[in-house]
Design a protein with these regions (language model features):
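Acidic-aromatic/histidine active-site loop/patch
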Residues: 1-32, 192, 200, 269-284
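Walker A/P-loop phosphate-binding motif and the immediately C-terminal alpha-helix
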Residues: 26-73
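Phosphate-binding loop that captures ATP/GTP phosphates
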Residues: 55-115
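Hydrophobic/aromatic-enriched cytosolic interaction surfaces used to assemble or bind macromolecules
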Residues: 87-90, 225, 258, 263-284
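Flexible beta-alpha connector loops of hexameric P-loop NTPases
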Residues: 87-92, 122-128, 177-178
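Conserved catalytic-core segment of NTP-binding enzymes
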Residues: 127, 131-234, 239
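C-terminal boundary of histidine-terminating zinc-finger modules
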Residues: 242-258
Length: 284
């Protein structure tokens, strides 16, 4: 077991980039990925945590942003808490610079992923408006290749701001009927908002092949193709979560970890495809 953990940490260290993003400037090319599930308990924070590790490298630095401003616990999933949080950036949205942002971010030591935490006090969640949240995300585009936002199941001002600015929405469901029903409601809303369906990457989480409803059936019901499945393995996922260790680091060869790595590749391919379409439309 110790050898497996050592191997996993070694692989994570290879994937990890520099702790600091000073001097980096990506223009406005960083991609904003919003992780959303319209039903609580579907695993959005767990996915955000591990997807961040899967996408991060020295060439493609990642920041994860806790958009659950009232009850966010993203930093605990990395076991990496700092003294500052998103409310320290919100009032300075028009005057952000790399140094100011880096003072607020916390870097996960074993992966290199940067973390922008939610406020620890419930009452402080009201200090961040949707406009201010958008300003922060736009600035993070200059510093990181991927900005991954973990959001709650409520469509509050901050989540709607994230949907509006996101390059890609990772929409999570499970095999539960209420979750699938809520996905249909969310898809109806995004259609009304004019969100291109190619900007939505549909993921089936906690997949149990013993259950009668499968990915194809869910795709038929929601009229959105399921682009990835993460198998259920609570005996593997929950202990790692309780220790504050991304499971993708603890054991990258587990089937759940492999599924996250595979989904990360699907995500990168979709972003590249959407970029090509956008370039073609601009040229014509």
């Amino acid at each position: 077991q110790n050898e497996k953990l050592k191997e996993a940490n070694t692989q994570a260290a290879v994937r990890a980039g520099h702790s600091s993003t000073s001097g980096r400037n990506y223009g406005d090319s960083g991609k904003i990925i919003l992780v959303f599930s319209p039903k609580g308990g579907s695993g959005s924070t767990t996915l955000t945590t591990n997807l961040g590790v899967a996408l991060h490298s020295e060439e493609t630095p990642v920041v994860v942003v806790d958009g659950k401003l009232q009850f966010g616990d993203l930093s605990f999933f990395y076991n990496q808490q700092g003294p500052n949080n998103v409310t320290d950036l919100a009032p300075r949205g028009n005057e952000l610079d790399h140094q100011v942002v880096e003072e607020v971010l916390v870097v996960h030591e074993s992966s290199g992923v940067s973390i922008l935490s939610a406020p620890p006090q419930l009452e402080r969640s009201e200090e961040v408006s949707g406009v201010e949240f958008s300003q922060i995300l736009k600035y993070l585009r200059r510093m990181f290749s991927y900005i991954i936002i973990d959001t709650g199941s409520n469509l509050d001002e901050v989540t709607l701001a994230g949907i509006d600015i996101a390059d890609l929405i990772v929409l999570i469901t499970t095999q539960d009927i209420p979750a699938i029903k809520n996905v249909r409601l969310f898809m109806n809303l995004t259609d009304l908002l004019g969100v291109d369906r190619n900007q939505i990457l549909f993921l089936l989480n906690k997949f149990d092949k013993r259950r009668s409803i499968n990915a194809d059936r869910i795709g038929d019901i929601t009229k959105q193709t399921v682009m990835g499945t993460i198998p259920v393995d609570e005996k593997f996922v929950i202990p790692a979560m309780d220790r504050g260790i991304p499971f993708i680091i603890e054991n990258p060869s587990n089937s759940v970890s492999k599924a996250v790595f595979k989904f990360a590749e699907v995500l990168k391919e979709r972003i590249a495809e959407n970029d090509q379409v956008e370039e073609f439309e601009l040229e014509n």
